[in-house]
Amino acid sequence: ALDYALELCRRLGFETKLCDKHRCGWAQIGAGETVVGILAHLDVVPAGSGWSYPAYDLSEENGRLYGRGVSDDKGPAIACIYAMKDILDAGISLKRRVRIIFGQSEESGEWDDMAYYREHEELPVFGFTPDADFPAIYGEKRLLNYKLTMPLEESGLLDIRGGSASNVVPDHCEARLLIDGREKCITASGKASHASTPEDGENAIAALAEKLASLLPQSPFVRFYRDRIGSSLNGELMGCALADIESGKLTMNVGTIGVTDVNLVMEIDVRSPVTFEADAVTEPLRRAAAEYGIEVELTQDTPPVYMDKNGDVIRRLLAVYREETGDFSEPTVIGGGTYA
């Protein structure tokens, strides 16, 4: 994807550079001492199941495009490339160079691409990422990822598997049980969505845990899930139902579950309101998990982004958007994490 994007930009007349063995790259137009940055990512979340169209082919029907990455974030990247091409073709004189920076590890949360860019390449004096919602985003919640580990107890649960990534609401989960000396397999289906909007999905791990409640009521895992997670999306049962005026409620998603050696491992994705520190989530989670013999590891803590929605940056973006669209919607805060 990165090779293609850079080749496309070269054909359109941009200056391009491939950075550090395909980790990231950029393409730019214009002249000037400083750079305005457009940060886009070319990686995608796992396709999952239930597609009506080939996930990794671009399909068009009734004026709509279908395929993994069409909206997040390959489609917006292409839109920005051709906006830059229009500026180039129009011969508009720019005070600064405009550079689109392509990354490839946004969805994984590693962001080693942007770390490399920051260390080795020129930093923009201003930037935005076309990776969220209109009209403009002035804040992103704190992103917390946790790994929960507990012994695979002798309560009849032999194996359990579900989910593809912590930042996706899982649409499938299956378990293998031993009941009255006989093995039994059960499955549960759900509806995938992004972990920042778990209300848009249906968590298959939660659905399977509910089924297990009647089959293995003494299982520590089953009791923990029932008592501390359940069907709640906002951390109420865990004791961390945080909220603030600017960014709303905390969201929590059990994204993956599996068995490694003799342990059961879950990954939980939390989007915490912008005014709270990580400990406001981590400490209640650890206390709740300890009651069931579960170890909690904080594997990612990405601080929140918060800008003045009445400041110059947001005001200018809104002015252009409103002039072109006639839409006077207010800027918002999101749960998703981006290159911003």
Which residue stretches match the model-derived regions?
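Buried hydrophobic packing segments
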Residues: 5, 77-87, 177, 208-212
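Short amphipathic alpha-helices in soluble, non-transmembrane regions
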Residues: 183-185, 280-289
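N-terminal helical capping/dimerization or prosegment-like subdomains
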Residues: 1-39, 43-47, 265-267
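A short interface-forming secondary-structure element
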Residues: 267-276
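Histidine/acidic-residue-rich, glycine-tolerant segments that coordinate divalent metal ions
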Residues: 95-202
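An extended, acidic, His-containing surface patch that forms the Zn2+-binding/catalytic region
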Residues: 199-206, 210-261, 275-280, 295-340
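Active-site metal-coordination/substrate-binding segment of hydrolases
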Residues: 35-102, 108, 120-122
